[in-house]
Amino acid sequence: MIIIPKNYVSPYGIMDTERAIKLIKDTFETTLACVLHLTRISAPLFVKRATGLNDDLNGVERPVSFEMKDAEGQTIEIIHSLAKWKRLALKRYGISLHEGIYTDMNAIRRDETLDNTHSIYVDQWDWEKVIAPTDRTLAYLQQTVNQLYNAFLETEAALVAHYPKCKAFLPKEITFISSQELEDRYPTLSPQKREEVFAKEKGAIFISQIGKTLRSGKKHDNRSPDYDDWELNGDLILWNPVLDSALELSSMGIRVDEKSLADQLQVANAEHRKSLDYHQMLLKGELPLTIGGGIGQSRICMLLMQKAHIGEVQASIWTDDMLQLCEENGIQLL
């Protein structure tokens, strides 16, 4: 199911689109690395299942897996994201306090439902930064979100300077709200509808504390219990005026420590994961305290370029019906 905006015409031809994609990605990557003190590193496309390093996302998505000839009997998985791998890399590389790493992450999410903003191909900047115990606060999380949002603003400014026909539309500041405050504000709406209404009102929002059970007995959304601390995480969401809908650009958070990992595994009935290598290191306090997240590259491009479909800024696979519908309505997929 996709949305076809009324009278949609992209302001960019296909080669202008490709050039603008490069401008956006280069500008954002450079700015992100500068404001968060990150160094680019190489990262894997796949990991061994037994390590527990793959990201379980919402806990139900199936990774693409295979066996390799020289390691028969060991299951290899295409990554969903690098949330856990990055934290291990910070330890291996000896990264200092308040310094971090980022990588170009490419993944396959086979169970994604295709629409204007979802693809089975995921490209994002995955980043992770070493923090102190005293940084494990909402205030530090919000400070980091503001730094990240400023990178969006600088990237938008660079795009507008290069392509005058492109108009700036992002608000100058981001609005913070917790998932509980959002539920209290709109108690009769579904979590997704709450996001829509609040994002449309504010333009740029960060919803914190996702994964925990709210006073209603429900969750705002599911989160895997073994990477984000559900009290210290959130989603950065911007309003997309072309699709007239909310668009999540980043999911991020302060990561679990020994206590929050144990608590969340218990709540999620996932204590069997304690035997995995990664979880053992965490429970023994052998990994640094960190904050990190993922930032959708194609989503940034489609939003800032005011594209109607993510396939206009990335090459992926779409259903025949979607391809035909897009072609009939002047939406040129790469």
Q: Over which residues does each language-model region extend?
A:
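Class II aminoacyl-tRNA synthetase-like tRNA-binding/catalytic domains
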Residues: 2-118, 126-130
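Generic recognition of stable, solvent-exposed alpha-helical segments in well-folded globular domains
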Residues: 19, 23, 27, 136-143, ...
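A generic secondary-structure signal for well-formed alpha-helical elements
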Residues: 32-39, 148-159, 308
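N-terminal pre-domains immediately preceding structured catalytic cores
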Residues: 41, 50-55, 166-179, 319
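A general structural signal for short secondary-structure junctions and capping/turn motifs
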Residues: 56, 66-69, 91-97, 117-119, ...
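Short connector loops at helix/strand junctions that flank enzyme active sites
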Residues: 73, 99, 122, 202, ...
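Extended, charged alpha-beta segments that form solvent-exposed binding/catalytic grooves
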Residues: 103-189, 193
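A translation/RNA-centric and nucleic-acid-associated enzymatic feature enriched
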Residues: 108, 179-334
